[in-house]
Amino acid sequence: MFRFSISLILILFPWHISFAETDLIISKIQTGWNDIQTMSGEFSQIDSDGNLETGKFYFLKPYQSKFVYANKDEDIVTNETLLRIIDKKGFQIDSYAIAGNALKKLLSNNLDIEKEFTIDYAIENEFNYEIQAGIKNASTSSRVILTFNKDTIELEKWEIFDELDNKTVLEFTKIKKNIFISQNLFVVRYKNN
């Protein structure tokens, strides 16, 4: 009986620590991220085909983002419901619904990580926190890995895996947070037919 009790403690105790550490990491990220209302900087993107794109990004909570590509003729603007592809003059080329998209959830006013995501793991290393998760109530099996700066809780990197396991990676640098970003930056124009 004594050996059974010791074995049970050794088996269950590490899991208890792991859950407690995960909850602490999630809490730190959530608190810090919810304090950030705007964020801008530069990004580099590697798509599922291995192509590298660079540019500037802008986040304005709730739900608005813009990715201005340095070496493409198109940019991306998002709001709560749509991802829009626009030309360099701001005219819409195409749009897609983003109902359960990770970016939409991240850019909400008050992110509740455990409500919005199914956590696979949350780890802490010397410089950052990393979470791998799926989107709760999503109709796809897409996954996301999010990396946050440990000191500033700035989003440094995301890796998105779609249902076919294609991966898109964005890394964020030269980050500024809680600065003024005009609503006009996210205006999409439409051509008259």
Predicted regions: what they are:
Residues M39-F43, E53-F57, S65-F67:
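One face of beta-strands
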Residues T31-G50:
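A short, Trp-centered hydrophobic/proline-enriched beta-strand micro-motif
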Residues W15-A20:
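Sec/Tat signal peptide C-region and signal peptidase I cleavage site
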Residues F57-K105, T168:
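An acidic-aromatic
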Residues S7-P14:
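Bacterial N-terminal signal peptides
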